């Protein structure tokens, strides 16, 4: 009887994991060291030395291109299409990748190669996802993108300023140190007269379909703590990925958007095209 129960539990575990089609089990089990607090401290060291970026939009109504979960591993066709699209857009000052940039042990330099050709618009803001730290790949992520906890400001010709706050949720928690930084940053931001405040992270606040099994999801307690904090200080939207399936939830005046995945193997991949103006509008663009 005991053996049968053990077999059932093992089968249940692997059936749950199978729903994440390219989840690398070895990478997940081997750990995602360092911890979130350690990753935060390393990110803050970079931020202290280099500061936070202010970008200049070419128009008061400008575009931000947003993708997630490319899981690049050997091919990067759709990633290259995304890069070409935002670079060709005359009113796009920045693009955001919401994490799970790579899959397994892919070199981040392979991801960055399409960004190396000369272009006035090569500003990519990266979010750290769970696959980006599997196999202890944090050191490679930080070498490529420098920090996983930061903010950047986009300033328009008329002087309007939009704030984008990026926080690390790669292993399903923001940790105590980053949570305090997030509160301090949002408290400061609420007094600065920003036109819009947007949160960018990998793990979504609300998990409805269970497609990612037990990988990197917030506890209920942390979900409510983040929801209270973000809504308290006027965050208008939170953009995230991880679930591979689009989902839009409106709660406490804040819109939480899970963006579709954009893997080369996906049957219906999309990225999100956001128009930042008096209002924030968005649409989802199919990728070939």
Regions found by a protein language model. Give the residues of each.
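N-terminal active-site segment of His-dependent metallophosphoesterases
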Residues: 21-110
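Binuclear metal-dependent phosphoesterase catalytic core
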Residues: 23-45, 187, 246-288
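Beta-strand-turn-beta hairpins that frame and shape the catalytic cleft
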Residues: 53-65, 151-165, 193-196, 250-256, ...
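His/acidic metal-ligating clusters that form di-metal
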Residues: 85-94, 123, 163, 173-256, ...
